Amino acid sequence: MVNGEAEAECTRASLLGRYEIGRTLGEGNFGKVKYARHLATGAHFAIKILDRNKILSLRFDDQIRREIGTLKLLKHPNVVRLHEVAASKTKIYMVLEYVNGGELFDKIAVKGKLSEHEGRRLFQQLIDAVSYCHDKGVYHRDLKPENVLVDRRGNIKISDFGLSALPQHLGNDGLLHTTCGSPNYIAPEVLQNRGYDGSLSDIWSCGVILYVMLVGYLPFDDRNLVVLYQKIFKGDTQIPKWLSPSARDLLRRILEPNPMKRINIAGIKEHEWFQKDYTPVVPYDDDDDNYLDSVLPIKEQIDEAKQEKPTHINAFQLIGMASALDLSGFFEEEDASQRKIRFTSTHSPKDLFDKIENVVTEMGFQVQRGNSKLKVMKNGRGSKNLRNPSSFLVCTEVVELGPSLYVVELKKSHGDPILYRQLCERLSDELGVCKTEQIQRTESLEDDLESFDSGSSLPGF
């Protein structure tokens, strides 16, 4: 182990000795991104310097490995390039392509919307890059304008592959089963808590990006997350009539809520709107990056840490990596400070409320039931005042997303968090929602947010 650490320190010294490190480009929960210049060639790079202890403590080692492993596979002009990786005892260094034009999000925010000509050019690059990734067996799963960078020539670069899926993540049915993505860009089938085709869900996200580029605002948006899910699930959006007929047709075919009817990559490339002035991008040659073959000599340390530390997700990770929220297989945490949890279900509202009422009654809670809401209460020490410190109140609501699909929301107004956890565990057992370890995530989020408020800086990447 000592020899490995010494070798890692030499690797780090060798790497940093080849670069002149400059200003900070960004800061986050894992470390910083620094501007760097290669001393021998003068080429510009961005070096992501990550704190290994934080990665281990926040249980993000798998996500960092996934990002590195994915970027090793991808060598395309419209994908951010990973050039070099090194690790010391305390840090991980990722030397990335420097993209100096900012995010596509900023470009749209400044202009309001893009012309069809400019939007088409960028969309062609986006589809070329996504098609290339899919051919490599990589599904991004978090495509959005914030994860699409623009270089000084105005060309795009897809970034942030921390949530990407590789072929080994597919289930026996050939489908993905882990829900990732940002709410406004997530495909409706991903919300259904079933397996989904990663290529078709990426296409949906590309369609939302195209809509934003051409129209200037989101096709699906609402401050209420449940209402937003309803709109996405139903494909409830209006395509402006001032767009060209062919642009409107392509948007309609991409934003088709039924993935079996949605246009695929090949269909997009053959579409008349896409074909105009289209020149396919040629991927880079598969030149060897030999220094990537010895990436991260940290597996032994990570495996040891896994045996010592329980699985959980805390507030620092939540704020810094909000896109990693699981929106279906587990309670989706919108605002931990409000103790709100949600899950999807195919049970009817009546069945859901009947089961919830049976469980909470057995646990000694009182119930008030309405048409689409149910209150779970317990008075403290015989007091009729529900604001008594020892009292407990949880409000439950069921909202229809679509045919035979509902969102159940539980919101703890006040009360003992341990009692709330016990309630969640009982409900999860009865409804078959999630595993105990996932319930623990909710509890740790709640506790960590309270300690987080006392003094940490806001992460940014």
UniProtKB/Swiss-Prot annotation:
Cofactors required: Mn(2+)
The organism's place on the tree of life at top rank: Eukaryota
Catalytic residue positions: 142 (proton acceptor)
GO biological process, one term: signal transduction
Chain residue ranges for the region called Activation loop: 160-189
SUPFAM superfamilies reported for this sequence: Protein kinase-like (PK-like)
Entry function: CIPK serine-threonine protein kinases interact with CBL proteins. Binding of a CBL protein to the regulatory NAF domain of CIPK protein lead to the activation of the kinase in a calcium-dependent manner.
Family to which this protein belongs: Belongs to the protein kinase superfamily. CAMK Ser/Thr protein kinase family. SNF1 subfamily.
Domain notes: The activation loop within the kinase domain is the target of phosphorylation/activation by upstream protein kinases. The PPI motif mediates the interaction with the ABI (abscisic acid-insensitive) phosphatases.
Name of the featured protein: CBL-interacting protein kinase 1
